[in-house]
Curated annotation (Swiss-Prot):
This is Holo-[acyl-carrier-protein] synthase. Its EC number is 2.7.8.7. It is found in: Cytoplasm. It is an enzyme of class 2 (transferase). InterPro entries: 4-PPantetheinyl_Trfase_dom, 4-PPantetheinyl_Trfase_dom_sf, ACPS, Ppantetheine-prot_Trfase_dom. Its cofactor is Mg(2+). GO terms for molecular function: holo-[acyl-carrier-protein] synthase activity; magnesium ion binding. Belongs to the P-Pant transferase superfamily. AcpS family. Mg(2+) binds at D8, E56. Keywords: Cytoplasm, Fatty acid biosynthesis, Fatty acid metabolism, Lipid biosynthesis, Lipid metabolism, Magnesium, Metal-binding, Transferase.
Amino acid sequence: MIFGVGVDIVEIRRIKEAIEKHNTFIDRIFSKNEIEYLKNRNLRPEFVAGRFAAKEAVVKSLGSGFRGFDFKDIEIDRTASGRPTVVLKGKAKLMANKYGNYKIHLSISHGVDNAIAYAIMEVDKIEDSDCKDI
């Protein structure tokens, strides 16, 4: 069953500025695997913005905000065909595991000015009182 839905939109211009002005931005937000992927794409701001939006959308689908974990606990990967996938680590994974088996569906897109990501989290069980059937 669907546990949560998250969507995030990011201005590519703001991500470009963050990359140019803050040497630590990429290292603070992305894992080594993600950085390698982004460097292979010359750190193009639209790709960085898409991955950033994806992390935000995943957090929203978890329904927790960044409580107890950080950006690197959510890794955005891709299949051989290019479909984006989510790998949860650390406390983000522990949080998702509370609901048994889970799957996160992810879509990322960008235009000239914005990048957007949409995440849907499916779980086996829901124990949160806010989510019980009436």
